[in-house]
């Protein structure tokens, strides 16, 4: 629900596109790439797995990005969760269940191994990270800092509440992305 909260927080200031992404990572990256080509956004914002995808897109599209609690090692998250799962946010297609299996984990492993291959130093100050101080799932701030300089914190957990999105995420987007337009 962070995407919906961001759309609401920036209403009248920016159009926030909140797509349902495909489950399989290569399909999701193709979908995002096509969406960027069609919509021509001014910035990318993602949370968790969405941050994993956004940071892989940045070198190709040269957009600034805000990565919320980026989960750079999705395989670590997925392995103990093999089986049927539920999406946290309602999906437009109504399908709330998905399956985590070894094939899906292998697909993420392939991308993880190459996720920083296209990184270049010009991105150091164009990609922002925001990390929940109570996040018990993703602890990738040190890895983020190996590549990027802009780091922020908020007091919440891995999935920010709507209030945390309004109070912490939206101001970063407004100050750093909208004012540059």
Report the location of each language-model feature:
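Conserved alpha/beta-hydrolase fold motif
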Residues: 43-44, 65
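A general structural motif
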Residues: 13, 41, 62, 124-126
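Active-site catalytic motif of lipid deacylating hydrolases and related acyltransferases
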Residues: 1-38, 158
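Aromatic pocket-lining residues of Rossmann-like dinucleotide-binding sites
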Residues: 57-61
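Short, highly selective alpha-helical patches that border small-molecule cofactor pockets
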Residues: 2-3, 7, 54, 140-144
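Gly/Ala-rich beta-loop-alpha elbow adjacent to hydrolase catalytic centers
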Residues: 45-54
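The alpha/beta-hydrolase serine catalytic core
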Residues: 64-181
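Glycine-rich phosphate-binding loop signature in dinucleotide/nucleotide-binding domains
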Residues: 37-40, 180-181
């Amino acid at each position: 629900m962070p995407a919906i909260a961001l759309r609401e927080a920036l209403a009248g200031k920016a159009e926030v596109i909140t797509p349902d992404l495909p489950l399989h990572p290569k399909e999701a990256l193709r979908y995002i790439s096509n969406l960027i080509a069609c919509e021509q956004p001014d910035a990318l914002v993602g949370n968790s797995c969405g941050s994993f995808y956004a940071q892989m897109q940045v070198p190709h599209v040269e957009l600034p990005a805000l990565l919320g609690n980026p989960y750079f090692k999705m395989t670590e998250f997925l392995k103990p969760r093999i089986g049927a799962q539920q999406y946290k946010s309602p999906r437009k297609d109504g399908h709330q269940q998905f399956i985590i299996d070894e094939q899906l984990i292998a697909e993420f492993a392939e991308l993880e191994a190459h996720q920083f291959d296209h990184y270049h130093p010009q991105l150091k100050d164009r990609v922002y990270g925001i990390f929940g101080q109570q996040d018990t799932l993703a602890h990738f701030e040190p890895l983020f800092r190996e590549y990027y300089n802009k780091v922020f914190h908020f007091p919440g957990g891995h999935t920010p509440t709507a209030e945390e999105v309004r109070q912490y995420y939206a101001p970063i987007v407004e100050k750093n992305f909208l004012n540059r337009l």
